[in-house]
Design a protein with these regions (language model features):
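Short, Lys/Arg-enriched N-terminal segments with co-localized hydrophobic residues
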Residues: 1-13
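Residue-identity detector for threonine
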Residues: 2, 16-17, 41, 51
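Glutamate identity and glutamate-enriched acidic tracts
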Residues: 10, 59-60, 72
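Generic N-terminal initiation segments characterized by hydrophobic and/or small/turn-forming residues
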Residues: 10-11, 49, 89
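Anion-binding alpha/beta catalytic cores of soluble intermediary-metabolism enzymes, centered on
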Residues: 10-33, 40, 77, 83
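Glycine-rich phosphate/diphosphate-binding loop of Rossmann-like nucleotide-binding domains
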Residues: 22-68
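Glycine-rich phosphate-binding loop
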Residues: 76-92
């Protein structure tokens, strides 16, 4: 049996931190939120909207769609992604 080396994740891409200052202060954003586990997803939505506002995104530039559960998220996200006026889709 030979010894295995452990992978060093120190310089891996997943260690990169992206903060709100890297968002453009313009654009239209869609947020798709699952109603399932509402007590969690509402708080995630609040955090996402607060982060967009902190980056200078106006309330008018944010569209929110509630869906019943996780299965519907990709369907609605794909519809938003096909719209020419949406710059990013956030799925919660």
């Amino acid at each position: 049996m030979t010894a295995r080396s452990c992978r060093n994740y120190e310089n891996d891409f997943m260690s990169t931190t992206i903060d709100g200052s890297q968002f453009p202060a313009q654009g239209s954003f869609a947020i798709v939120v699952s109603r399932y586990n509402d007590s969690v997803t509402r708080r995630l939505l609040d955090g996402a909207v607060d982060t967009l506002h902190a980056a200078g995104i106006s309330e008018e530039s944010i569209q929110i769609a509630w869906v019943p559960g996780a299965w519907e998220i990709p369907l609605v996200a794909a519809q938003f992604a096909r719209q020419s006026g949406i710059d990013a889709v956030i799925c919660l």
